[in-house]
Regions:
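Short, low-complexity export/processing leader segments characterized by acidic and small residues
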Residues: 2-4, 190-191
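General beta-strand structural signal in soluble alpha/beta enzymes
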Residues: 3, 29, 39, 73-74, ...
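N-terminal small/polar loop signature for handling phosphorylated ligands or for N-terminal nucleophile
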Residues: 3-51, 167-178
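Catalytic cores of large soluble enzymes that bind and process phosphate-bearing ligands
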Residues: 5-8, 35, 122, 126, ...
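General structural feature for long, well-ordered alpha-helical segments within catalytic domains
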Residues: 12-16, 24, 39, 130-133, ...
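Gly/Ser/Thr-rich loops at beta-strand to alpha-helix junctions
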Residues: 33-37, 79-80, 197
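A glycine/threonine-rich phosphate-anchoring loop and its flanking beta-alpha core
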Residues: 49-147
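Active-site segments that bind and position negatively charged phosphate/pyrophosphate groups
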Residues: 140-193, 197
């Protein structure tokens, strides 16, 4: 069991790779928000592509050859859609910067999005992750790769966030609002996975 932290670091990932190797496990179970998903993706990719000795060598578009260790993702937030995207963000403590790693081989094998797992998320995090999804949707509309089909998803995401976010914050156990936000955050990140190839 690896307990990651917000904004996972290179050293978190290194510790996770070592823990996974010594565990004898066949898969990684990632439970939490975007940071948990990002940590799991980095651990899974490095484990199956040991020529990349640490996550720093994966910054940018990674040239891995093998798919990640199987990852089962159970998100507890609705904001990053990290459970279904090809990128992850890790903090390089030594150089004091965040690294974006892009790799189609890192997508979790299974993503189980259950709104009930989000019921106990504090109001402040519900709001913050919801605004993260909104930011991603707006970004998707203005990115160079946007086109009519990706715009359709981003506009729908913005409409759903407008409809459900306040209710999800004010009524944390409202299933309709939580499900709506779970779908909206997914739609808001579709542009990350190659918007011109939808």
């Amino acid at each position: 069991c690896i307990r990651d932290r917000p904004n996972p670091t290179v050293s978190n990932v290194k510790a996770g790779v070592e823990a996974f190797a010594s565990s004898g496990a066949d898969f990684i179970l990632a439970i939490g928000g975007g940071s948990s998903m990002d940590t799991a993706k980095a651990i899974g990719i490095i484990t199956n592509n040991p020529e990349f000795s640490d996550v720093v060598s994966l910054e940018g578009v990674a040239d891995t050859k093998k798919k990640s260790v199987p990852i089962i993702a159970l998100p507890t937030t609705a904001g990053t859609a990290a459970e279904v995207t090809i990128n992850y963000v890790i903090t390089d403590e030594q150089n004091q910067k965040k690294m974006v790693c892009v790799d189609p081989n890192d997508i979790p094998s299974i993503a189980i999005v259950d709104a009930e797992l989000m019921y106990t998320l504090p109001k402040s995090l519900t709001a913050a992750t919801g605004l993260d999804a909104l930011t991603h949707a707006i970004e998707g509309l203005i990115t160079k790769g946007a086109w009519e089909m990706s715009d359709m998803f981003e506009i729908k995401a913005i409409e759903m966030i407008n409809r459900y976010l306040v209710t999800a914050v004010e009524e944390p156990s409202n299933a309709e609002a939580r499900n709506g936000m779970a779908v909206a955050q997914y739609l808001s990140l579709i542009h990350i996975s190659e918007p011109t190839r939808l």
